[in-house]
Amino acid sequence: MAAQAPVDEIAQLSVSDAATTKPKPGLDSATATNGNLNRDSDDSDDDAENAAPGAETGAAKKKKKRKPKKKKKNPTAQSDPPRVLISQLFPDKVYPKGEEVEYVNENRYRTTNEEKRHLDNLKNDFYNDYRHAAEAHRQTRQWAQKNIKPGWSLTDIANGIEDSVRALVGHQGLEEGDALKAGMGFPTGLSLNHCAAHYNPNAGNKMVLQQDDVLKVDIGVHVNGNIVDSAFTLAFNPRYDPLLEACKAATNEGLKQAGIDARLGEIGGYIQEVMESYEVELDGNTYQVKPIRNLNGHTILPYNIHGGKSVPIVKSNDQTKMEEGDVFAIETFGSTGNGYVHEEGEISHYAKRMDAPKVDLRLSSAKSLLNVINKNFGTLPFCRRYLDRLGQDKYLLGLNSLVANGVVESYPPLVDKKGSYTAQFEHTILIRPTVKEVISRGDDY
């Protein structure tokens, strides 16, 4: 989820009521059966068979031996759409590691140092939660990349992704507190074309994906508050391929430069150099790919998607260093436009502020809604569809009040100039004592 560079003023919240739409059949949150898996079933037999002809009346009936019940095996493959629990696919509850990369130069010793390895082992549960979330992310996005096509509505895409995430981690988030255990780390970002980030369809949204669209898909998955933040871009017209390649290469460069004692401003310079080496030809015009300079990567803290450190994607004088134990989202945004975004459009993303003040709320609807937010999301970002899903209605006045009182932060869509195209790629990386681990790395990107 994008971190916006600080601005002097926040755009005024603008929201509107809309009716809830029903998701496309087959994308609901009910657990689906994996039709590709062989399941063992119990044999059923008659308790007894009739006496043989000629047998004496009252003779004891012969009984067949009851066969022992066969134990049902754990699934060995994922269903389509994904509904098999990740914990069933990995019954030992040890989840796959991400891409481990050894440190270089003065930090090379860390890979084999006994003290650092001991420190690493102390955080195995923390790492395993992250790997659990990362595996759910990989399997969800694999389905999304395979199935999302022009003609799908953004609402169906969002429901398909979010239903999959909840099913894979085993928490539907409909009971009080359930979504705080595992599930969505933030609302799925589905930002089209010149919109770079923070767009998610509200109820009643009728937008449909078109053949010439460039779609940023930003998915957050958490387990026990440990959030994997990773994004990719889909384009169905090959003319946008260089734009996507620029962002993917720039993100990989940022990951390469990341590590203990790496200076954030210098990482931004490396990212910028790679990004600007790409060009895109559209309608006879050639555009240098520009990094969107007021969007940044960021640290991730438990239940807090935007920690205190920012990773610029252009060179800066920021001398802040990455440190052992940090978790970073390394993300880059490229644009054929101005390379600068502003807030515009209907708001869908919100989050309770970590430093939310204690305010005497006058509106009863605001008090009631804050109670719902505390019990279901805490400080995790949420969207209006998530409130709809919990059965909340007529909450906009209360939500506006919470925003106005500084209790809840709103995140409007972030857009470059109209007619331009933007792309995004992002990974989450753990700065471990011994190695750096790109926790969300997959075969796709």
Swiss-Prot record:
Signal peptide: none annotated. A divalent metal cation 1 binds at residues 218, 229, 426. Residues 1-89 are annotated as: Disordered. Binds 2 divalent metal cations per subunit. Has a high-affinity and a low affinity metal-binding site. The true nature of the physiological cofactor is under debate. The enzyme is active with cobalt, zinc, manganese or divalent iron ions. Most likely, methionine aminopeptidases function as mononuclear Fe(2+)-metalloproteases under physiological conditions, and the catalytically relevant metal-binding site has been assigned to the histidine-containing high-affinity site. The keyword Signal does not apply. It is found in: Cytoplasm. The keyword Ion transport does not apply. It catalyses: Release of N-terminal amino acids, preferentially methionine, from peptides and arylamides. PROSITE patterns: MAP_2 (PS01202). It comes from the Eukaryota. Residues 60-74 have a biased composition (Basic residues). Its cofactor is Co(2+); Zn(2+); Mn(2+); Fe(2+). Its EC number is 3.4.11.18. InterPro entries: Creatinase/aminopeptidase-like (IPR036005), Met_Aminopeptidase_Type2 (IPR050247), Pept_M24 (IPR000994), Pept_M24_MAP (IPR001714), Pept_M24A_MAP2 (IPR002468), Pept_M24A_MAP2_BS (IPR018349), WH-like_DNA-bd_sf (IPR036388), WH_DNA-bd_sf (IPR036390). Substrate binds at residues 198, 306. This is Methionine aminopeptidase 2.
